[in-house]
Amino acid sequence: MEITSTSNSRVKEWKKLNTKKGRKKQNKYILDGLHLVKEALKANKKVEELLITSKFEHLNEIEISDETKVIMISEEVSKSISETQTPQGIFGIVSIEEKKTTYPQRDVGAWLMLDGVQDPGNIGTMVRTADAAGFSGVILGEGSADLYNPKVVRAMQGSQFHIKVINDNLSGWIRHFKDMKVPVF
């Protein structure tokens, strides 16, 4: 059965995932597009629901877990959920993992700390660059854009599934790295 109405209660809940308040309340976020969905599944992230349109032609490229519920949606619903001009017709609804502060104890590697970076595109670019450069992770400090903001998620292009990316207090991390004699710049 296909969901065709943008007034459907499920559609309204999915649309709320485009807001920080909605993501926090549902403890989920949305992936928009084939590449992001494939990266999440490849990284064994819990994709609770997969929303696809009848025109989506790449379903055979995706290994879907038995736990993932596949829901057919209309093009109109797809356009109402997406924040892009031309949605690809596939969305993943992903659980936000609870991330406790666990400082690395050895083999720290390089970490990028971002303080007050509010532009989603800039965050995504820096996370992708850190991933490509072999960094261990990225820490978004206070005042930075929300990690699960759809624009940030889209800009990271799946790099968030390759390295650790967390929102946390930078001063604790700086103190930890200095205690370990790791240079902090």
Report residues per predicted region:
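Short active-site oxyanion
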Residues: 25-28, 46-49, 67-69, 137-138, ...
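Short, aromatic/basic amphipathic alpha-helical patches
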Residues: 58-67
